[in-house]
Amino acid sequence: HLVGQAVCDNIDERHQQILPDYIYGDGDPEGVRQRAAEELIKTAHAAKEFGVKVINGFTGSSIWHLVYSFPPILPGQIDDGYEDFAKRWNPILDEFVKCDVKFGLEVHPTEIAFDIASAQRAIDALDGHPAFGFNYDPSHFGYQGVDYVEFIYRFADRINHVHMKDVSWSSTPKDAGVFGGHVDFHNPSRYWDFKSVGRGNIDFEKIIRALNDIKYTGPLSVEWEDGAMDREFGATESCQYVKDIDFPSSNIVFDAQFAENSED
């Protein structure tokens, strides 16, 4: 995740705390981006040797600072950002194809894709590159007002991995809104916060049904964050919750079963 963030980001001193020293180096922004790209290519080749078929991560974004359109965005600035993304990621993804490995971008604020519209734009920028897909995580959609179930159907052939992670958002106004108000997580003044799986607002029943509909057979990976709960307890209960709510899809049409029985 963290190395991928540096491929497209506008690099500054914050990145030093999330990157290995051999990637950050002297901190020269373009040097950091190039070393990050090289590391991802090496990761794809390592995955091939281990028989791993999916690598999840971030892409970073040179235009995240433009997410709020003021001062007014200049013509071409957003297009330039997606062109930069394609220029940097196409060579990486070409190596993924050679290794028979797919990339799963966790659609997330600060990335080139952070909702349905921007995810589609990322695909278009890459001309539908076959190695590019998504690590689906509903917790980054719900509080934004993004249809997290529709995302599954819209990108059915590109759901490469699934994070089961929960989030809650308030039904009433709060002091710190969607943008967080520079307030730490687990603060009652926040509009939204991550929760142990099953304790937030995400409808996992709908997610399981949608994943079954698109015939997803990959893992349901619990990603756990809840500032009010003991980690061991939370991780344990979240795993059990996912096991309890998951179910296999039917291989028959319901009405057809009656016709079959009537013939017996």
Residue spans of the language-model regions?
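A structural motif
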Residues: 47, 52, 159, 216-217
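Active-site acidic/histidine proton-transfer and metal-coordination neighborhood
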Residues: 7-134, 232, 256
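Active-site beta-loop-alpha junctions enriched in small/polar residues
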Residues: 2-7, 60-62, 108-110, 137-141, ...
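Conserved beta-strand positions in the central sheet of alpha/beta enzyme cores
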Residues: 1, 56, 160-163, 221
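A short, acidic, amphipathic alpha-helical segment used as a generic capping/interface helix at domain edges
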Residues: 199-213
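Short, acidic/polar
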Residues: 35-46, 144-152, 204-207
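Acidic/histidine-rich catalytic cores of soluble enzymes
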Residues: 79-201, 253-254
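C-terminal helical cap(s) of enzyme catalytic domains, especially alpha/beta-barrels
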Residues: 231-252, 258
